[in-house]
Amino acid sequence: MKTLIKNGSIVTKEGTVKTQDVLLHDGVISAIGLNLEETDAHVIEANGKLVTPGLVDLHVHLREPGGEAKETIETGTKAAAKGGFTTVAAMPNTRPVPDSAEQMSWLTGRIDETGVVRVLPYAAITTRQLGRELTDFAKLKEAGAFAFTDDGVGVQSAAMMLEAMKEAAKLEMAIVAHCEENTLIQNGSVHEGVFSKKHGIAGIPSVCESVHIARDVLLAEAAGVHYHVCHISTKESVRVVRDAKRAGIRVTAEVTPHHLLLCDEDIPGLDAHYKMNPPLRGKEDREALIEGLLDGTIDFIATDHAPHTEEEKGQGMERAPFGIVGLETAFPLLYTHFVKKGTFTLKQLVDWLTIDPAETFQLPYGRLEEGAPADVTIIDLEAERAIDPAHFASKGRNTPFAGWTCQGWPVATLVGGKLVWEEKEVAR
């Protein structure tokens, strides 16, 4: 099947915007140019709309198996499609954990059955994510693992992490790390700062994250592995990663939209929709994250989409689980609050959500060029509306951004040339 996207606005490598047609055929982008005509193609009229590579999110929680009340592979990937994401990477903190070839094979089969977009499954570093014994990396890679992580918890043993890094390096695979030193968590629910002091709640100090990253970058240097830091959140962590990159260590990092947009001073009362891990940090941390993204210390943006039920989030700040959803709101939030205000350019935002995560992990996605996979997102930069969780495709409604008015909403998403989501009025 052929699909012809007509008159869309494309961001060039130079950062300018120009009108182009894009022809998709047999799963790839077959032509980009002006006045393309194909008599047997399905036509999507994109006049006045932005056409980008399909967005790539390398940090999501799809909850299946074991957490289907929160999300499933089907609902999570529908949320991804609605948010413009054509590729997502699924974290392994499910029950059971994908820590064996058998479980990974089941997971990839389930993805093939019910996934709406491309899903790259992470495998666990340690059995059941308990930090006691390594999984069989070679067998997991053969079964379809994308990379290795114990996300949700940090690998506490330096010896265990070094062994994991050496095994991953042999396979030319990445170690992806949730960075927390357990002895410093202090049973905290929020950042140790303004909010925790005001409300008398135990806080998680910044050093809990940064000391773990500092340890790991030195281990990564010794092992010669690609080491990736999940959801970086503190100014000290940014400094550690910046110094490591300058030293030539193969370290990369991601940041979430919520850590770019909010700090602990923005939390209104004890609302658990503002509870995530890592927590919202201080104002200086938020500023350092923006600076780190702009100077290349931080490589790309990832949502850390983490759905929970309303009942769980209704338990209050101290008892509710950590996490918020993000797939359906990431682009409009970032476009409205950073591109429209001049902090980021449109090209920077698109790159951080497409080519940069893809290139960081040597993926073929995130490109709008002839011969690339036909993964395309169409966005109406003028469309403006308030975020309404009731309309989410995700099962999760747990967002701190409900009611925020944003511009820049995806209107069509194509994966491998197939239209997987659209607002009906965009197609003809």
Curated annotation (Swiss-Prot):
Binding site for Zn(2+) 1: H59, H61, D151, D304
EC number: 3.5.2.3
Cofactor names: Zn(2+)
Gene3D superfamilies in UniProt: Metal-dependent hydrolases (3.20.20.140), Urease, subunit C, domain 1 (2.30.40.10)
UniProt-annotated catalytic positions: D304
Matching Pfam families: Amidohydro_1 (PF01979)
Superkingdom, taxonomy of origin: Bacteria
Keywords for this protein: Hydrolase, Metal-binding, Pyrimidine biosynthesis, Zinc
Entry keyword annotation includes Zinc: yes
Entry's Gene Ontology cellular component terms: cytoplasm
GO biological process: 'de novo' UMP biosynthetic process; purine nucleobase catabolic process
Enzyme class: hydrolase
Annotated cofactor note: Binds 2 Zn(2+) ions per subunit.
Similarity annotation: Belongs to the metallo-dependent hydrolases superfamily. DHOase family. Class I DHOase subfamily.
Protein's name according to its UniProt entry: Dihydroorotase
Species name: Halalkalibacterium halodurans (strain ATCC BAA-125 / DSM 18197 / FERM 7344 / JCM 9153 / C-125) (Bacillus halodurans)
